Amino acid sequence: MVSNLELQNKIAILLVSHGSSLPFAEVTFNEIKDKFNKATGFATEVGYMKVAEPSIAGAVENLKEEVPELEKIIAIPVFLAPGIHTNIDIPTLLGLSPLETDPRCPDGNYPDDHYLSIAEDVDFDGDIELLPAIGPDDNLLEVIDKRINESLSDSKLNGDAKTGILLVSHGSRLKYNKE
């Protein structure tokens, strides 16, 4: 049986984010990274698709430095639902095959200034496993429920008031994700 310590010397975790020009987004992802690292012991980095640093390739370099015997990177897009970024952009940026044809550029020849054309190549000889988007995980549903209940308990509405709950999400250009 392989021990967790042996795995920690060979496997690292890459949390993939879209990236934002707003500094609090980076602070939030670094906090998630630090909490995950502390809870699991696995070397963990955040890699950003665009706008923020480190890039996905830069984060892979950081993991290689932190784990000299690195054999495998488990990459998870920190996205709620599958879409263009999780199925096309992130696999491409990791040097993997996209999971489907890009409706923005079906021939795969992106314009010279497109971020997929100008991104650094990932330099890693080991295995990269790309996990799916987070999806409707029960733990996420618990967080949503807790936040809504906190809001309702802080509400100044009386018991006769009617309250609706609206979940807002980004959406996707993919045909099967238009609901």
Residues of each region from the PLM?
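Extended amphipathic ligand-handling, pore-lining, and cofactor/metal-binding catalytic surfaces
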Residues: 1-179
